[in-house]
């Protein structure tokens, strides 16, 4: 199993979990520049992996918006290069897409894969373009449209700003959080994603919604998660932001019925938070 992006938020956890279960080759940018096709081909030719979990990416959506050429080189061309090299050695590819492909859709309710994505951001457009390019190279490759993910704030592995980190920081520092009331999205425990990747090896090729469902607004989600964490009076320091997304609510909430039909399921967002906080309950 070759894992790209092995020093990042997701890739580090994938490498940690599957080491010992597979012969893991954990690759970071220092070992392979995915924007350079020949660099990718050399490394794949050396290791000839049976399975590739492609996590390397520019995942900061704001950075991608400010640096569109770099985002395209890494997120689109980089994934295309990995797909080509993987196909050349006969490996099974699982690569990461995003719920951001839906960030321009105006439909309400959880969105299934049958809805045509209409991304309006650089990151979302790049992810959708990546899906098309990979599908043309290797129809058996599996793309996973991930939600925003979190881990416990005390994790020794790399942490990004996420639901639990943001809540703890605001509560401990006594600062205010403004959270959108007109945004709907799933938020998923990264460990739930990691432990379900192995089952994806059996999936037919294509793009799948992959993460926790959630029918609450982002504001409601933050309030309820704060209560689960035992952070007092969340309505006093988590403030509703009704000004974001004025034209229509931003709906990234995904319907995961398709992945569920293959025996892969996730708890909804709040149940996932509860399990993360109280794992033995």
Model region roles, listed by residue range:
Residues 135-185, 192:
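NAD(P)-dependent short-chain dehydrogenase/reductase
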Residues 73, 77-81, 101-144, 149-150, ...:
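Catalytic helix-loop patch of NAD(P)-dependent Rossmann-fold dehydrogenases
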Residues 34-74, 85-88:
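NAD(P)H-binding glycine-rich loop region in Rossmannoid oxidoreductase-like domains
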Residues 1-19:
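N-terminal Rossmann NAD(P)H-binding glycine-rich loop of SDR-like oxidoreductase domains
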Residues 232, 247-281:
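C-terminal amphipathic/interface module of NAD(P)-dependent oxidoreductases
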Residues 194-245, 250, 277:
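Mid/C-terminal beta-alpha module of Rossmann-like enzyme folds, strongest
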């Amino acid at each position: 199993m070759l894992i790209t992006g092995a020093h990042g938020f997701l890739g580090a956890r994938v490498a940690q979990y599957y080491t010992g279960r597979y012969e893991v080759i954990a690759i970071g940018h220092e070992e392979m520049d995915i924007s350079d096709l020949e660099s990718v081909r050399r490394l794949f030719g050396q290791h000839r992996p049976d399975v590739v979990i492609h996590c390397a990416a520019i995942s900061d959506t704001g950075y991608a918006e400010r640096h569109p050429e770099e985002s395209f080189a890494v997120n689109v061309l980089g994934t295309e290069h990995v797909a080509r090299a993987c196909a050349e050695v006969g490996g099974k590819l699982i690569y990461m897409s995003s719920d951001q492909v839906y960030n321009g859709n105006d439909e309400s309710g959880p969105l299934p894969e049958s809805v045509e994505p209409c991304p309006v951001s650089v990151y979302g457009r790049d992810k959708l373009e990546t899906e098309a390019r990979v599908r043309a190279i290797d129809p058996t490759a599996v793309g996973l449209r991930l939600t925003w993910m979190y881990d416990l704030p005390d994790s020794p592995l790399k942490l990004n700003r996420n639901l639990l980190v943001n809540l703890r920081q605001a509560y401990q520092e006594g600062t205010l959080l403004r959270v959108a009331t007109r945004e709907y999205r799933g938020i998923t425990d990264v460990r739930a994603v990691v432990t379900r990747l192995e089952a994806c090896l059996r999936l037919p090729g294509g793009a799948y919604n992959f993460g926790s469902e959630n029918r609450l607004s982002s504001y409601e989600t933050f309030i309820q998660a704060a209560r689960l964490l035992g952070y007092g009076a969340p309505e006093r320091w988590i403030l509703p932001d009704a000004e974001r997304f004025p034209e229509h609510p931003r709906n990234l909430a995904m319907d995961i019925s398709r992945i569920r039909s293959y025996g892969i399921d996730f708890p909804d967002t709040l149940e996932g938070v509860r399990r993360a906080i109280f794992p033995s309950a």
